[in-house]
Amino acid sequence: LAAFVGAVEGPVSALYAFGVLIPLAFVALLPAAAASGVPLPASVVAGVYLVALPTALVAAGAWLLAKRPVAFPPPQIGADHPAVPDRRPHAIVVGVLTAVGAGIVTAVGVARWAAPVGAAGVGIGAALLVAVRPRRVVLASVNETESGLPDAMTIVGGAVAEGVAVERAIASAGDRLTGATGDLFARAGRRSDTLRVDVREAFVGEGGPARTVPSPRVHGAVALLAIAAREGRPAGDVVLELADQLERLRELERDARRQLATVTGTLSNTAAVFAPLVGGATVALATGIDAAGVDGLHSLSAGGSGAAPSSGSGLGGFTSDAAASGGDRARPLPVPVLGQIVGTYTLILAVILTSLSTGLEQGFDATLVVYRIGIALPTATVTYLVAFVAAGLLW
């Protein structure tokens, strides 16, 4: 994992440059190209920003994630989990209502063309948060349980090595530990004592506290404890060895996340803040360049030939006399269309970069990925719109 941390920085920097900085900077050149008589049709710009670039980013991200070493797969929290109710109807209602509200506010406060961007980003983000919240709660409980597992196994292993029965050692661990792990072992100890069942049944039997915990680490520890209950005192050293391995793994993961913090932090900040900020400001700059460039060309045309400027020019047109004469070859790209394309691209970046950042840091945990995307989308949307308005006031 340490080698992966060093190897990933270069590819992530390249992805950052060619997937974010250069494409967003190129947006400002589009009105200049149109004013110079070389307009790019909307279909070409949309194809590049909404198909080609996202496809390349997804491929690069998948390549990076495939190289990440994984000691344990992340928890898989399915819809059949008893603590995960079906929130899809609630998510749809909340998503639609927030999308409508965000669209109206955006149309009134920013621009009519920005309403679809505002509605999509805020609405989808809100729907994802509502839909994934129960799974996020379960995931937090699983993570807390796993974090205390090395301590619990150390207590049990030490007691078993001294000749204490596994069942009593489990109950003792439950009494000495706090939090989710202590509760898990305490409940298993009570079940074993009350129902007179074996260790495996106490943990993962019908109604067992670990039965619905979707953690390979927890279930692996339970399997070892069940073997220790059969083998007796000699198995204590094996349990202690597992506890040491879990502790080393926890330290390794903590250290790797700390080393990856710069890379993953940059990706997360770019997804939610930097890319939308640059995108909104660049679209505002493109608007100003469009107005200044087209008016300048028309003035030169009028001064040189005595002809009046074409009535087809305007702030949202990206038009020029040369473009008009070549209108049959390529329709110029209006600012509203450009703003929608760039806005959609920033939302796509929010999804892709947030997924990549989370995958590099935690492994591709679907619950955590969806949860963070649900936060990143509204944040990116608001940042994009505010940047457009603020930059427009400056320019």
Tell what function each PLM region has.
Residues 1, 232-247:
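Short, charged cytosolic
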Residues 1, 149-234, 388-395:
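Glycine- and small-hydrophobic-enriched helix-loop-helix hairpins
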Residues 2-162, 177-182, 210-212, 244-395:
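Hydrophobic alpha-helical signal-anchor/transmembrane segments
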Residues 170, 238, 369-370:
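Hydrophobic alpha-helical membrane segments of integral membrane proteins
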